[in-house]
């Protein structure tokens, strides 16, 4: 995993996992909104007591990371994807200052797609593919 901090409260992560599974103890007290894009592979994990989540190539997941601990499996023994992470409200303030021409209400997005503890997965979102594919074309020296 390679993480780049773009602005205060905004990070970009390139995820490249080559394994069958791992156990996560991740817990946070931060108010987060994470957007995960799966480029290749598949990842599965429990997303609460009565919920299970998976993402595979072309899927987009919006998540608050409230249920991000437990046993993660990679049925294809690999996963490649990108995560854009927002730590609210710091990220909201940074975006207002750094990207004034692109008004986005992160709290509203979080409320729309992540109103519960469970992630929202959009399976097979081809209209989103090109946006995330462009992030793989970023020159190494600025990653």
Regions found by a protein language model. Give the residues of each.
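N-terminal functional module of multi-domain proteins
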Residues: 1-81
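Alpha-helical bundle regulatory/interaction domains
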Residues: 46-143
